[in-house]
Amino acid sequence: MPYQIENRPPDLRERMYFPEIIRGIGAVTKHFLRNLFFTRDKNPDILERRRGEFGWADNVTLQYPEERAPYPPGYRGLHRLVPREDGRARCVACYMCATACPAQCIYIEAGEYADDPIEKYPVKFVIDELRCIVCGFCVEACPKDAIRMDSGEHTPPSYERGAQIWDEKRLLRGPPVSYQYDPWLRRGSPSIPAEKLEEMRARARPFSTVATDEYAQTPGFSVRALAQEAKDRAERAK
């Protein structure tokens, strides 16, 4: 049942704002004293070096960019496409990541292998990092563990917006990964030599390791332009 609340008019003490002013000064003073006399950095290596240099300096200033604080384990960095052992992308162009993306920043064009018509691969795989809201839905939706955000890198600075649009050449990086349930390991592939296929099967594992590397400096494209180009081709085909 709804009830009505009567709003009383503020008294003189509240209209003068003295309690709020004192409360704000107290909060500023508390943080000032804490930062002046107590440490803010929990890294023991940095703390030990600072104490060795200054003796009393527990309040640590991180000398960026020479010193960088490590990202937490769950940090969502830049995207990367996970490669297979043979260098191809694990992506099968199922469009699940593009469908799950709420920002619609992923554009994919699918193609088929000439020697394996059952499986598809991304002819174009483009991510607009400026539109990305870093929700991680694409990673969760991928059934092949083909896209990850474990690079540990944030978006690099750039003077042009087009430099933040990453294509498949720039995204395909990191250590190769194979799983025991990969279909190309079970049925084989004519384009992969038998020795290489056996090596891939031997290295296949239920879980993969995470590693990072530097991203390739490959120029990207515009996601909207690619989508419009595909739409125009479809209309011309009609």
Swiss-Prot record:
It comes from the Bacteria. Coiled coil: none annotated. One of its GO terms (molecular function) is quinone binding. Binds 2 [4Fe-4S] clusters per subunit. [4Fe-4S] cluster 1 binds at residues 91, 94, 97, 142. It catalyses: a quinone + NADH + 5 H(+)(in) = a quinol + NAD(+) + 4 H(+)(out). PROSITE patterns: 4FE4S_FER_1, 4FE4S_FER_2. NDH-1 is composed of 14 different subunits. Subunits NuoA, H, J, K, L, M, N constitute the membrane sector of the complex. NDH-1 shuttles electrons from NADH, via FMN and iron-sulfur (Fe-S) centers, to quinones in the respiratory chain. The immediate electron acceptor for the enzyme in this species is believed to be ubiquinone. Couples the redox reaction to proton translocation (for every two electrons transferred, four hydrogen ions are translocated across the cytoplasmic membrane), and thus conserves the redox energy in a proton gradient. This is NADH-quinone oxidoreductase subunit I. It comes from Anaeromyxobacter sp. (strain Fw109-5). The gene is nuoI.
